[in-house]
Design a protein with these regions (language model features):
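Hydrophobic beta-strand scaffold residues
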Residues: 64, 90, 174-175
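Short beta-strands and strand-loop turn motifs
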Residues: 116, 140-148, 173-182, 210
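Conserved phosphate/ATP/ADP-binding segment of small-molecule kinases
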Residues: 161, 168-173, 179-248
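A glycine-rich helix N-cap at a beta->alpha junction
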Residues: 82-98
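Short, well-ordered alpha-helix to beta-strand connector turns
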Residues: 2, 137-138, 171, 203
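Short, flexible loop segments at the rims of nucleotide/cofactor-binding pockets, characterized by
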Residues: 42-44, 118-123, 150-153, 181-186, ...
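Glycine-rich phosphate/adenosyl-contacting loop at the front of the ribokinase-like
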Residues: 1-67, 74-85, 110
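Conserved phosphate-binding/catalytic loop of the ribokinase/pfkB sugar-kinase fold
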Residues: 91, 95, 105-157
Length: 248
């Protein structure tokens, strides 16, 4: 019998306009007020931890159940239709009071991606949306992205702590993934060092990116890395000894 996996949390519709070929050094070379840019097709697919990790594991042969929330709107229909193509929409919740989350992904050649993101129904996702009867049968519970889910970072992450603790008590291994934080949003004002300090005792596998972790634990270092990258990808300018090890 296959060991079961639960992937829960953030799901959205990703809309990625395809830019013309040719790397540039700054966003301003491409995007400026009043300018018209002739684009390629738009790549439309599911995004977020639930779809990205869940469907990948399913395609690799794992017995996966997805748990996420969408609105009763056109984007929600599109997400569920895509998941249905993988026989994976069971466990998804439709909330008539919420709108479906989406991201417009600006992937300009030579520039780190820019995300225009609407969290939508993800903001209201809570422990009560988890089917614990299924969790009790699972060997692994993977959750992401609390950084884009207001219910999970409010009150110093009380709901996130409650979730991961409750899941770990069922005997399942727990895994937590993050996403980038908008510094000007409520998530950007949250005390992430405190939230992580309260949550990680109930997490077996923690898989943030260096940018996400640096933003949360050392904002000055994060801003320094952004300056050093000069509009490019931060990972291109990282030093293992000076930048990565101090965060470990």
């Amino acid at each position: 019998m296959k060991k079961k996996v639960i992937v829960a949390g953030h799901i959205c519709l990703d809309i990625t306009p395809v830019f013309p070929d040719g790397k540039v050094k700054s966003v301003e070379q491409v995007l400026s007020p009043g300018k018209l840019i002739q684009m390629g097709n738009a790549d439309v697919h599911t995004g977020g931890a639930v779809a990205n990790t869940g469907l990948a594991m399913k395609l690799l042969g794992a017995d996966v159940s997805l748990m996420g929330k969408v609105g009763e709107d056109a984007f929600g229909d599109m997400i569920l239709n895509i998941l249905d193509g993988y026989d994976a929409k069971e466990g998804m919740i439709r909330d008539k009071e919420s709108t479906t989350s989406y991201s417009v992904v600006l992937a300009i050649p030579g520039i780190d991606r820019i995300f225009l993101h609407h969290p939508g129904a993800n903001h209201t996702f809570a422990v009560s949306d988890i089917d614990f009867d299924k969790v009790k049968e699972a060997a692994l519970f993977h959750f992401g992205y609390p950084t884009l889910m207001e219910s999970m970072y409010n009150n110093d992450g009380a709901e996130l702590v409650h979730l991961m603790k409750s899941v770990q008590e069922t005997g399942a291994a727990t895994s937590l993934d993050l996403a980038a934080v908008d510094a000007n949003s409520k998530a950007g004002q949250a005390d992430w060092a405190k939230i992580l300090g309260r949550t990680l005792p109930y997490v077996d596998f923690f898989v943030p990116s260096i940018e996400e972790l640096c933003f949360m634990l050392d904002r000055d270092k994060f801003e320094e890395l952004q300056v050093r990258a000069d509009g490019g990808d931060i990972t291109d300018v990282l030093d293992i000894e000076q930048d990565v090890k101090p965060l470990a």
